[in-house]
Amino acid sequence: MAKAVTVKIKLVSTADTGYFYVTKKNSRTQTEKLTMRKYDPVARKHVEFKETKIK
């Protein structure tokens, strides 16, 4: 069976609230770590989220 191209990743808030999003990314085209500015409802503002592995 072939290896999956899309990988599930976890985007963790840099505001240290413990809030995270789960999303997918194409591991062949996006080799670097993903960072996004998204809304953190615990901090109640937009902060940067960084990619980590799902355990």
UniProtKB/Swiss-Prot annotation:
Swiss-Prot/TrEMBL keywords: Ribonucleoprotein, Ribosomal protein
Domain of life: Bacteria
InterPro entries, per database record: Ribosomal_bL33, Ribosomal_bL33_CS, Ribosomal_bL33_sf, Ribosomal_zn-bd
Alphabetized Pfam families for the sequence: Ribosomal_L33
An annotated GO BP: translation
A single Gene Ontology CC term: cytosolic large ribosomal subunit
One example GO MF annotation: structural constituent of ribosome
PROSITE patterns registered for this protein in UniProt: RIBOSOMAL_L33
Family note: Belongs to the bacterial ribosomal protein bL33 family.
HAMAP family, alphabetized: Ribosomal_bL33
Name this protein carries in UniProt: Large ribosomal subunit protein bL33
Organism: Methylobacterium radiotolerans (strain ATCC 27329 / DSM 1819 / JCM 2831 / NBRC 15690 / NCIMB 10815 / 0-1)
Gene this protein is translated from: rpmG
